[in-house]
Amino acid sequence: MRISALEGCRVALWGWGRESRAAYRTFRAAFPKQPLTLFCTIAEATEVQALADPVLSIETEVSVPRLAAFDVVIKSPGISPYSPLAVAATAAGAHFIGGTQLWFAAHADTDGVVPGAVCVTGTKGKSTTTALLAHLLRAAGHCTALAGNIGMPLLELLTPQPTPEYWAIELSSYQTGDVARSGARPVLALVLNVFPEHLDWHGSEQRYINDKLSLVTVTRPRIALLNAADPRLASLALPQSDLRWFNRRDGWHVRGQVVYRGDRAVLDTALIPLPGAHNGSNVCAVLATLEALGLNAVALAPAACNFHPLPNRLQFLGERDGILWVNDSISTTPHATLAALDCFLGRCRVAVLVGGYDRGVDWECFAARITRKVPLDIVTMGANGPHIQALLAPLAAGRFGLHAAVDLPQAVALARTALGAQGGVLLLSPGAPSFGAYQDYVARGRHFAILAGFDPEVISSISGLGIA
């Protein structure tokens, strides 16, 4: 559905996050006098009323009959279509679309392809990978947009001037289905990895995997680029796309800490400001993307050394009193926490803070791995903290310290005490979402920075968003 098709329709917005705000501005720019209804919270309604929009109706209670009363409901990506309310509304005739769906439909050419669109998804690493891709495309002299789930809704760049040559677009599992439903196809779709996350939104592990992979299985990109080291991805067959791989010995891969193209050594990852073996894989993904687009990836690889890392992703805040503070607030799965720990274990003393919102993710894998290479201390916190504590308690004796905190300030205090005068690394890598305690992972990371004694404004901005 294109935006023009909304003219004369009964339209509602459901949610008032950043994506919905962008959808509101887009709708109002196209149809200044057309009535619009917004379903939002009471707190959000106060903010929205300040817009003084005479043809905007605000409702703070949402129901099946009200949703079904509209021709189209533009839904915030954070609202699950699998929730009982959304399912019942759909059965009653409600038609939901998303802002990402509107953008892709608006930009598709006559063949259904969105020129220059490179979509990046994966359970972890997608923000860093998308930003690094934009960085290297710009280093090659190409006007490139960096947008999507990374922090700039696509609808904020609906009709940019000049039109970018490339679009580096990060997509969450909430948004990949939007692309599939738009009928549009990206030039290239990159999938980094897939393991269980967002089970509360998707309802099951298999549905999460299906929704995530719809970017390549349903959307049919011209080029599908997959991680050969991921078992779920390695088994895919995509006959309607040009299927490419990274993390294979005959292509882009990492040996030790060096990035190779086949047998040719190209780049030492120690020169790139992205710690961890997982980031070496992300670099390979970006270079394989550039190559698939027909660019000289080998020549562009050194420009990765000038990349500015993103906040809240293994972000080195600085050192205070012998303690190196590392903010990995983006970590929302146990797999991500294990990857963060791998950057430090065996090299220095580490106290790690884990736990947060409980969405039913299994921590058994964390417990199994943590005994092989142990940190100095683990501090649990948040709603799933007691569950993690119970899993780790039988393993801790004589191996690592284990403490329980009620919140982040107490967790930080316990970790500082554990590190003591000898110091070490104090790592926030929760392996769980921030909901319930914070608005989002950014707010959690900012609070961590304050507790560490650093200015949250300095460490929170993402450079390069938009078009450059």
Curated annotation (Swiss-Prot):
Pathway: Cell wall biogenesis; peptidoglycan biosynthesis. GO terms for cellular component: cytoplasm. It comes from the Bacteria. ATP binds at residues 122-128. Gene3D superfamilies: Mur ligase, C-terminal domain, Mur-like, catalytic domain, NAD(P)-binding Rossmann-like Domain. One of its GO terms (biological process) is cell division. One of its GO terms (molecular function) is UDP-N-acetylmuramoylalanine-D-glutamate ligase activity. Its EC number is 6.3.2.53. Keywords: ATP-binding, Cell cycle, Cell division, Cell shape, Cell wall biogenesis/degradation, Cytoplasm, Ligase, Nucleotide-binding, Peptidoglycan synthesis. It is an enzyme of class 6 (ligase). It catalyses: UDP-N-acetyl-alpha-D-muramoyl-L-alanine + L-glutamate + ATP = UDP-N-acetyl-alpha-D-muramoyl-L-alanyl-L-glutamate + ADP + phosphate + H(+). The keyword Transcription does not apply. It is found in: Cytoplasm. InterPro entries: Mur-like_cat_sf, Mur_ligase_C_dom_sf, Mur_ligase_cen, MurD, MurD2. Pfam families: Mur_ligase_M (PF08245). NCBIfam families: murD. Belongs to the MurCDEF family. MurD2 subfamily. Cell wall formation. Catalyzes the addition of L-glutamate to the nucleotide precursor UDP-N-acetylmuramoyl-L-alanine. This is UDP-N-acetylmuramoyl-L-alanine--L-glutamate ligase. It comes from Xylella fastidiosa (strain 9a5c). The gene is murD2.
